[in-house]
């Protein structure tokens, strides 16, 4: 596959090359996937500049992979690869996900709305600082971004084909204290009304 800047526009960051492993050109590759063995099935991988990397041999080691790339035949060549990020294009990914699984690249750019259908903004990114996935949203009103937990409580509905996802503002922490108190008071009032019946 020939490098094309246009084709790599929709790239997906899958792994990063780490330390050399042995003296014959193998490297440890940290894979950002639950199934590191799939890395080879994607075919050609690319770096930030579009240089292609072809996997000749891949062995899984814990949640990472020991990889031998075509043309990398000694430790010195392997050392030169340390820190290179590896990407595939979105169309190289296999679409065999479960109903509640998504590729992050498919969610970026989706419209974000609350449970009443009011537009809040757009998904602009994902982060994980160790405590779980966070969804970055560029808000319409504040022209700023916020991070919310990417959980079923905060994001109860995702509809990729229709181009939107639903965010529950209370669970997502998007309300200020005044708005939060109003919602809590409304909930308490509703509960009181039900108790009277």
From Swiss-Prot:
Signal sequence interval, chain numbering: none
Keyword Cell membrane: no
Superkingdom of the source species: Bacteria
GO-annotated molecular function: ribosome binding
Residue stretches making up the PRC barrel domain: 99-174
GO CC list: cytoplasm; ribosome
Chief location of this protein within or outside the cell: cytoplasm
Entry-linked InterPro entries: PRC-brl_dom, PRC_barrel-like_sf, RimM, RimM_N, RimM_N_sf, Transl_B-barrel_sf
One Gene Ontology biological process: ribosomal small subunit biogenesis
Subcellular location: Cytoplasm
Keywords associated with the record: Chaperone, Cytoplasm, Ribosome biogenesis, rRNA processing
Family: Belongs to the RimM family.
Its job: An accessory protein needed during the final step in the assembly of 30S ribosomal subunit, possibly for assembly of the head region. Essential for efficient processing of 16S rRNA. May be needed both before and after RbfA during the maturation of 16S rRNA. It has affinity for free ribosomal 30S subunits but not for 70S ribosomes.
Oligomer status and interactors: Binds ribosomal protein uS19.
Domain text: The PRC barrel domain binds ribosomal protein uS19.
Protein name: Ribosome maturation factor RimM
Organism: Bartonella quintana (strain Toulouse)
């Amino acid at each position: 596959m020939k490098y094309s800047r246009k084709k790599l526009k929709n790239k997906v960051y899958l792994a990063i090359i780490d330390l050399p492993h042995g003296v014959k050109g193998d490297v440890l590759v940290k894979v950002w996937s639950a199934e590191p063995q799939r890395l080879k099935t994607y075919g050609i991988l690319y770096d930030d500049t579009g240089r292609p990397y072809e996997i000749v041999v891949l062995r899984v080691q814990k949640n990472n992979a020991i990889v031998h790339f075509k043309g990398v035949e000694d430790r010195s060549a392997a050392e030169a690869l340390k820190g290179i990020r590896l990407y595939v294009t979105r169309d190289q990914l296999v679409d065999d996900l479960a109903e509640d699984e998504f590729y992050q690249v498919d969610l970026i750019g989706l419209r974000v709305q609350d449970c009443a259908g009011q537009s809040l903004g757009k998904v602009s990114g994902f982060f994980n600082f160790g405590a779980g996935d966070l969804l970055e949203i560029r808000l319409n009103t504040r022209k700023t971004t916020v991070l919310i937990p990417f959980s079923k409580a905060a994001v109860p509905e995702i509809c990729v084909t229709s181009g939107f996802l639903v965010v529950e503002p209370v669970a997502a922490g998007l309300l200020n204290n005044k708005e939060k108190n109003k919602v809590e008071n409304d909930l308490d009032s509703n509960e009181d009304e039900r108790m009277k019946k």
